[in-house]
């Protein structure tokens, strides 16, 4: 075999021409100590706060404490694989999560990896978990209603798209139930729902997933789960990951409902991380920036201006109180950040009044502007009568000889309380709620026994649906005009004749 010298030289020339010199500079450091999910790293001189770090064995971390001679980082994975002396590389990227339509119907962890065994998720975009909230000019006031399907809420503490409404109460008072019912009620409303489970039991998350799947609600829902068995950094990240995914849809002009269940456990996870990072503790051993932790998260809920597509994120954070103590540190923080709160009482829950919402101390500071006219017409009277009833009930315990008017008011109050009761997973359409409130405040239930009120309500609504177009008219007009009211009165009178 003859090798010609010119052939060899042409190959060498070609290789020299194709050679591209590239220099990749990577910032790296060394692990000084590791333990409790925290690593102290020497080096990494140009690292950013919140930057993603690469440890050996594919384990990732996040830089949080940038100190004079070392970096404190939290480990987002199996910390037992990391040892002293390991090399750590800075990636130059902040922590981001995948966002896209493919996430709908899936259960993911705080890093955006699927944990439901349904295979990979293919997305076109990554969203940073920490991001500045929309500015003042970019927003518009809350004006569209977000119907929860729960009579007590839609009537007395209405929620609008772009609002932050806190759900607060002791454990086992039905906080999550309200959130899940709200997700169920968004079916067909073109609202994407994100349920963020922070520090929940795995069995609880599985139960919620099954219920939403059975009812066909996972088609528009994403579950972000950082369960109790996961490390504090992942529980800390979960709500930010959830809202980052929500922002992807909001920027496309869509409406999003996000539930944080619950922020008490989120604050505990952050406290654990902060203490391990040697940050100075404050009240109840929480770090000084625990208010900012929740304010920067909840400020990302917004109703964008029409120029920016008019999308919205509505946030329903949940807070668990201890023995009804609303004046504790975290509850007062979140109450002051949000636009109102729905207060659940164990006393009401145990007495069989469910959902156990105390309408007297529950408020919605901006939702009133978003209520439909028909609901405003009937619900304002309900709230007033309920407040008077609660007051009279206290007096009635002491005095036995009550006058006729007081007795009548108490009887009306009993019927209002009965109308407000609602089984779980049975959200009410807004037009049905309007009729329910209308019959109770206009005295159509005064001659019906309290024990038969709910049966009367159900059968009347079925009768109206089958024999009239009143419900459709309320839904279309969104108001109760004189003609419609006359029709409704007539139908109620006709139905009463056949009700036994």
From Swiss-Prot:
GO terms (molecular function) for this protein are: ADP binding; ATP binding; proton-transporting ATP synthase activity, rotational mechanism
Reactions listed under catalytic activity:
ATP + H2O + 4 H(+)(in) = ADP + phosphate + 5 H(+)(out)
Q: Which GO terms describe its cellular component?
A: plasma membrane; proton-transporting ATP synthase complex
Q: Per its UniProt entry, what is the enzyme's top EC class, as one word?
A: translocase
Query: What coarse category fits the chief subcellular location reported for this protein?
Result: membrane
Q: Alphabetically list the UniProt keywords.
A: ATP synthesis, ATP-binding, Cell inner membrane, Cell membrane, CF(1), Hydrogen ion transport, Ion transport, Membrane, Nucleotide-binding, Translocase, Transport
The compartments listed are: Cell inner membrane
Per UniProt, what is the membrane topology? Peripheral membrane protein
- Annotated positions for site Required for activity: 362
Q: What is its EC number?
A: 7.1.2.2
Q: Spell out the subunit comment.
A: F-type ATPases have 2 components, CF(1) - the catalytic core - and CF(0) - the membrane proton channel. CF(1) has five subunits: alpha(3), beta(3), gamma(1), delta(1), epsilon(1). CF(0) has three main subunits: a(1), b(2) and c(9-12). The alpha and beta chains form an alternating ring which encloses part of the gamma chain. CF(1) is attached to CF(0) by a central stalk formed by the gamma and epsilon chains, while a peripheral stalk is formed by the delta and b chains.
Family, per the entry? Belongs to the ATPase alpha/beta chains family.
Q: What does this protein do?
A: Produces ATP from ADP in the presence of a proton gradient across the membrane. The alpha chain is a regulatory subunit.
Q: State the protein's name.
A: ATP synthase subunit alpha
Q: Which organism is it from?
A: Fusobacterium nucleatum subsp. nucleatum (strain ATCC 25586 / DSM 15643 / BCRC 10681 / CIP 101130 / JCM 8532 / KCTC 2640 / LMG 13131 / VPI 4355)
Q: Which classification does the entry list for the species? A: Bacteria, Fusobacteriati, Fusobacteriota, Fusobacteriia, Fusobacteriales
Gene of origin?
A: atpA
């Amino acid at each position: 075999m003859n090798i010609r010298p010119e052939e060899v030289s042409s190959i060498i020339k070609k290789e020299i021409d194709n050679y591209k010199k590239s220099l990749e500079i990577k910032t790296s450091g060394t692990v000084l100590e590791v333990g409790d999910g925290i690593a102290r790293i020497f080096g990494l001189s140009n690292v950013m706060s919140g930057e993603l770090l690469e440890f050996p064995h594919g384990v990732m971390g996040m830089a949080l404490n940038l100190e004079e001679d070392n970096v404190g980082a939290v480990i987002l994975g199996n910390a037992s694989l990391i040892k002293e002396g390991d090399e750590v590389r800075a990636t130059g990227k902040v922590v981001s999560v995948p966002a896209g339509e493919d996430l709908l119907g899936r259960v993911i962890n705080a890093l955006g990896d699927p944990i439901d065994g349904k295979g990979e998720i293919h997305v076109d975009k990554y969203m940073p978990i920490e991001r500045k909230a929309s500015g003042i000019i970019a927003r518009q006031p809350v004006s569209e209603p977000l119907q929860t399907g729960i009579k007590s809420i839609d009537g007395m503490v209405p929620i609008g798209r772009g609002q932050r409404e806190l759900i607060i109460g002791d454990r086992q008072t039905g906080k999550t139930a309200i959130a899940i019912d709200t997700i169920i009620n968004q079916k067909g409303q073109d609202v994407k729902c994100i349920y963020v489970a922070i520090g929940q039991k795995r069995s609880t998350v599985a139960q919620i997933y099954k219920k939403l799947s059975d009812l066909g609600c996972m088609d528009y829902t994403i579950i972000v789960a950082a369960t109790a068995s996961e490390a504090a950094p992942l529980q800390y990240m979960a709500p930010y990951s959830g809202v980052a995914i929500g922002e992807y849809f909001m920027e496309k002009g869509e409406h999003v409902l996000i539930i944080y269940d619950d922020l008490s456990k989120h604050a505990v996870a952050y406290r654990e991380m902060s203490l391990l990072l040697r940050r100075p503790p404050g009240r109840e051993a929480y770090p000084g920036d625990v208010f900012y932790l929740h304010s920067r998260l909840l400020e990302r809920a917004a109703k964008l201006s029409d120029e920016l597509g008019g999308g919205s994120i509505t946030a329903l954070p949940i807070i668990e109180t201890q023995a009804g103590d609303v004046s504790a540190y975290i509850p007062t923080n979140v109450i002051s950040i949000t636009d109102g709160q729905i207060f659940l009482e164990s006393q009401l829950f145990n007495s069989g009044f469910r959902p156990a919402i105390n309408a007297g101390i529950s408020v919605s500071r901006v939702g009133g502007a978003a209520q439909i006219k028909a609901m405003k017409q009937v619900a304002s009277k309900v709230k007033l009568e309920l407040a008077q009833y609660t007051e009279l009930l206290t007096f009635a315990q002491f005095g036995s000889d009550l006058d006729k008017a007081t007795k009548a008011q108490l009887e009306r109050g009993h019927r209002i309380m009965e109308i407000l009761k609602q089984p779980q997973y049975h959200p009410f359409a807004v037009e049905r709620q309007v009729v329910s409130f209308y019959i109770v405040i206009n005295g159509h239930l005064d001659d019906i026994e309290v024990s038969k009120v709910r049966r009367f309500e159900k059968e009347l609504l079925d009768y109206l649906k089958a024999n009239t177009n009143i419900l459709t008219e309320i839904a279309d007009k969104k108001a109760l005009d004189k003609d419609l009211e006359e029709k409704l009165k007539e139908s109620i009178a006709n139905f009463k004749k056949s009700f036994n």
